[in-house]
Design a protein with these regions (language model features):
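Glycine/proline-enriched, intrinsically flexible loops and inter-domain linkers
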Residues: 1-117
Length: 117
């Protein structure tokens, strides 16, 4: 797996000294007060999504969940940030619908709600 190391130095991920596990590989872990932590992961695989939008979207979601689990946390919710072209183009609309249906099916399977996006 390739990690975009150049991205991480562009923002301060240690503001407020809450970072327990820094970003870069699995998910980041942040401290939210004395006894609470939050595991966060952003994932994407445009090549997989281009080849098969449904399976590509599921794969991104699944990878993010696996990375969260690797830190000892349980996936409890997700936020999506989907970017597609003009939905009036039938091919783009099809990729959008396939992606949404894949994400929806996998979210129901894992019982992980989409809480924003």
């Amino acid at each position: 797996m390739q990690v975009n190391i150049g991205f991480f130095p562009q923002y301060d991920h240690e503001v407020g000294i809450r970072t327990v596990i820094k970003p870069g590989f699995d998910s980041s872990v942040l401290r939210l007060g004395q006894w609470k932590i939050l595991s966060v992961k952003i994932d994407g695989n445009p090549k997989h999504c281009y080849i098969d939008p449904r399976q590509g979207a599921i794969g991104c979601f699944e990878e993010a969940c696996r990375n969260v689990v690797c830190t000892g946390a349980t996936p409890m919710g997700k936020v999506d940030h989907l970017q597609f072209g003009n939905p009036e183009d039938p091919e783009i609309f099809w990729t959008f619908m396939e992606s949404i249906e894949g994400i929806t099916d996998f979210a129901k399977f894992l019982n992980v709600p989409c809480v924003g996006g």
